[in-house]
Regions:
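Structured C-terminal subdomain patch of bacterial secreted/periplasmic proteins
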Residues: 231-264, 272
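Compositionally biased, proline/threonine/alanine/serine-rich low-complexity intrinsically disordered stretches
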Residues: 264-309
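Hydrophobic alpha-helical segments of integral membrane proteins
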Residues: 1-9, 57, 61-65, 241-248
Length: 309
């Protein structure tokens, strides 16, 4: 039920839709002679669009989330790489049979890079179809085609195709992967999406190492107008509002323990300070080895593995 309510609520309040609804309402009430109310709602509609498309509001809202989890030094050993869905054009791929990526496609490209760095690591992809009315191919269905093209064998993949949102991503993966206590799993998702994702994994007692990708801000936008293409600014604002609403809603229903989970909220993460599992400090020699990247060192020319039949 919460899934359907969240989709309906978001459809109503996302900036572009809300502006259209307010404009339609202003025209309707004006027809009944309530011109002052109609004028106020029309003004509200204009302000929503202007702030969303012509200012840096979206970047200012999104940047704190992107900066929450800096990328740590590469761990020496990795048991698996988790990739959360949201990187493919589902409707296009369903119609054309390809693997077209969207702005979140960095998730899967980075996963392929990590797959080369850690050749023994499993790659767990989670992503079904999370829309109410639009048809599309789930990311976990499309991902094997892209990975095969990039030289990642199908035998390394763990595919979770049923989840519709981040909460279901985590719950389904926890049951499917069943990680061992001493294993290290990298979590690859968009930087702005990392706080909510890590909060869910912590709640599920599934320790992960945050590996953020797909940054949408430079961190230098500042307060101003016309700092980006209006269409991109509108998309950034929409993304930021959606993520903040998601964080607040998940905290309200108890799915995460804080509104904006961070690296210092709990142990079980490998961070830039060299903290190991359980929050213990690594000895200086081990910490230096970790920061050198272990398996992340240069491995010479790339020789793609054979794709499994």
């Amino acid at each position: 039920m919460l899934f359907y309510l969240s989709k309906i609520f978001w459809f109503l309040i996302q900036p572009l839709n809300l502006a259209i609804f307010l404009l339609a309402f202003s025209m309707l009430v004006a027809l009944f002679g309530w011109r002052k109310l109609g004028g106020l709602t029309a003004l509200a509609s204009f302000l929503i669009l202007a702030l969303s498309a012509w200012t840096s509001l979206g970047a200012l809202m999104l940047n704190p989330l992107e900066e929450r989890f800096p990328r740590p030094p590469p761990p020496d050993e990795v048991a698996g790489i988790i990739v959360l869905g949201g990187g493919f054009e589902g409707a296009i791929n369903l119609a054309r049979g390809g693997y077209d990526v969207n702005r979140g496609g960095d998730r899967f490209l980075e996963a392929a890079v990590l797959a080369r760095r850690y050749p023994d690591a499993k790659i767990a992809v989670s992503g079904g179809t999370g829309t109410l009315v639009l048809n599309g191919e789930g990311d976990a269905v499309t991902a094997p085609k892209l990975f095969a093209a990039l030289g990642v064998p199908a035998s390394r993949l763990i595919l979770e195709t049923k989840s519709r949102n981040t909460y279901e991503n985590v719950e389904n993966l926890r049951q499917l992967v069943a990680p061992e206590p001493d294993e290290t799993w990298l979590l690859v998702t968009s930087a702005f999406h990392m706080p909510r994702s890590v909060g869910l994994f912590r709640k599920a007692a599934f320790p992960v190492v945050a590996w953020p990708v797909d940054y949408r801000t430079s961190g230098k936008e500042g307060i101003g107008v016309m700092r980006d293409n209006p269409a991109d600014s509108l998309q950034t604002t929409t993304m930021a509002i959606r993520e903040w609403f998601g964080l607040i809603a998940y905290k309200f229903v108890g799915r995460i323990d804080s509104v904006v989970p961070g690296p210092d909220d709990a142990s079980g993460l490998v961070g830039q300070d060299g903290a190991a599992r359980g929050g213990e400090e690594l000895p200086p020699d081990q910490n230096a080895q970790q920061q050198q990247g272990g398996q992340g060192e240069d491995q010479g020319p790339y020789e793609p593995p054979k794709v499994a039949d």
